UniProtKB/Swiss-Prot annotation:
The N-terminus is blocked. The lineage of its organism: Eukaryota, Fungi, Dikarya, Ascomycota, Saccharomycotina. This is Glycylpeptide N-tetradecanoyltransferase. Pfam families: NMT (PF01233), NMT_C (PF02799). It comes from the Eukaryota. Monomer. Residues 168-204 are annotated as: Myristoyl CoA-binding. One of its GO terms (biological process) is protein localization to membrane. Keywords: Acyltransferase, Cytoplasm, Transferase. Adds a myristoyl group to the N-terminal glycine residue of certain cellular proteins. Substrate specificity requires an N-terminal glycine in the nascent polypeptide substrates. Uncharged amino acids are preferred at position 2 while neutral residues are favored at positions 3 and 4. Ser is present at position 5 in almost all known N-myristoyl proteins and Lys is commonly encountered at postion 6.
Length: 455
């Protein structure tokens, strides 16, 4: 395979790593169609590109559930609405097929998401989840699932204000039906159902630029198994380097280094929850977890074998029993098609973390605080990379959100081509830093004030 073909393979991989079905490149003016050109979004309560936010808060006038229609939005006569029961194996399989075949545009890449029942139990069944918020569109005649969108309830923190919301995810329309304008109808229908439950705000992300991002972060990627990535043509060989050079450069030890590092247990929840809340309070856009939500997100199904495990959570316990650090990552592997040697590509995603390393300082940006935090995060996330590799993951991904820019360069996370834009629905907010400089390099000085992590 030529280097040009390998570069194309890598480009396709990076598209997949964006976890959305739209292509993206750098944030350019060309992508920013004027609001008047966004036919759908100009009718929605979202911030305009050039709007100067004076006061943060809801965009729409207050409403009640009684103001919202009880009837689903009309569809073309050949389609019908359905609610997906994620506990039903057949219905869940329909979602897998739809996402696998349509969630990413380029099907020549030779790889697909390997969605599992375990992943969706974790992602879609958080406390307070509603079957009615897992919405599908089927062809009446064949019952084929051709579109899907989901929402889960969350409480957002936006610069200290609590905002009851939903998190929108897994919006997917069959490629052959994208001219039917199903996406706006899906968004309106999920909005209607959520509004009927007296929730009026939402958080969502996309690789494309819509009106108008509250923040933008960049994807970064840390090879854990460079040789495998090269053998399946997901990465090329840089000029002036040998395979041995690249393997050595990305090598990791088999064992972690941090004393007291162990898996998170249920009996740790009270202590870790308090550590996590205090750490998250530094950021301007966060999810405010209940203790029940925290346990669901970070304990997972303990009885699962390693190859089916979704969430991996660890703590650092000191000799006196105090837990000073916590980190987590999740797994969403790819299936590799048409490869005789490898069937799967293990993909790990850095999730949430917390540490008390800089708690003694009043200002997180104090040089001494920054040094203490950077040192500790480099140690913790280095161990996270080792644990991810030991869990058969081949690439470890992180955004420039949270305090990630303090360790990305040191730990050999390379910048990806993908950018993730964060959006608030029916909530006007001033821009929030996403860990990027104007030239899209990592902003180590200001870091990011995005503390929420979207799947």
């Amino acid at each position: 395979m030529s280097e040009e073909d390998k570069a194309k393979k890598l480009e396709n991989l990076l598209k997949l790593l964006q976890l959305n079905n739209d292509d993206t490149s750098k944030f350019t003016q060309e992508q920013k169609k004027a609001m008047k050109d966004h036919k759908f979004w100009r009718t929605q309560p979202v911030k305009d590109f050039d709007e100067k936010v004076v006061e943060e808060g809801p965009i729409d006038k207050p409403k009640t559930p009684e103001d919202i229609s009880d009837k689903p939005l009309p569809l073309l006569s050949s389609f019908e609405w359905c609610s997906i029961d994620v506990d039903n194996k057949k219905q869940l399989e329909d979602v897998f097929v739809l996402l696998n075949e349509n969630y990413v545009e380029d099907r020549d890449a030779g790889f697909r998401f390997n969605y599992t029942k375990e992943f969706f139990n974790w992602a879609l069944k958080s406390p307070g989840w509603k079957k009615d918020w897992h919405i599908g569109v089927r062809v009446k005649e064949t019952q084929k699932l051709v579109a899907f969108i989901s929402a889960i309830p969350v409480t957002l923190g936006v610069r200290g204000k609590q905002v009851p919301s939903v998190e929108i995810n897994f919006l997917c329309v069959h490629k052959q039906l994208r001219s039917k304008r199903l996406t706006p109808v899906l968004i309106k229908e999920i909005t209607r159902r959520v509004n009927k439950c007296d929730i009026w705000h939402a958080l969502y992300t996309a690789g494309i630029v819509l009106p108008a991002p509250v923040s933008t972060c960049r994807y970064t990627h840390r090879p854990l198994n460079w040789k495998k990535l090269y053998e399946v043509d997901f990465t090329g060989l840089p000029d002036g380097h040998t395979e041995e050079d690249m393997i050595a450069e990305n090598a990791l030890p088999a064992k972690t280094k941090t004393a007291g590092l162990r898996k998170l247990k249920k009996e740790d929840i009270d202590q870790v929850f308090e550590l996590f809340k205090r750490y998250q309070s530094r950021f301007e856009l966060i999810q405010i977890f209940t203790k029940e939500e925290f346990e669901h997100n970070f304990i997972g199904e303990e009885s699962l074998p390693l190859d089916k495990q979704v969430i991996f959570s660890y703590v650092v316990e000191q000799p006196d029993g105090k837990i000073t650090d916590f980190f987590s990552f999740y797994s969403l592997p790819f299936t590799i098609l048409n490869n005789t040697k490898y069937k799967d590509l293990g993909i790990g995603y850095l999730y949430y973390y917390a540490t008390d390393a800089d708690f003694q300082f009043k200002d997180r940006f104090d040089p001494k605080a920054t040094k203490a935090l950077k040192t500790r995060l480099c140690e913790l996330i280095y161990d996270a990379c080792i644990l991810a590799k030991n869990a058969n993951m081949d690439v470890f991904n992180a955004l420039t959100s949270q305090d990630n820019t303090l360790f990305l360069d040191d730990l050999k996370f390379g910048p990806g081509d993908g950018f993730l834009n964060f959006y608030l629905f029916n909530y006007r907010a001033k821009p929030i830093t996403g860990g990027l400089n104007p030239d899209n390099s990592n902003d180590i000085k200001r870091r990011s004030n995005v503390g929420v992590v979207m799947l």
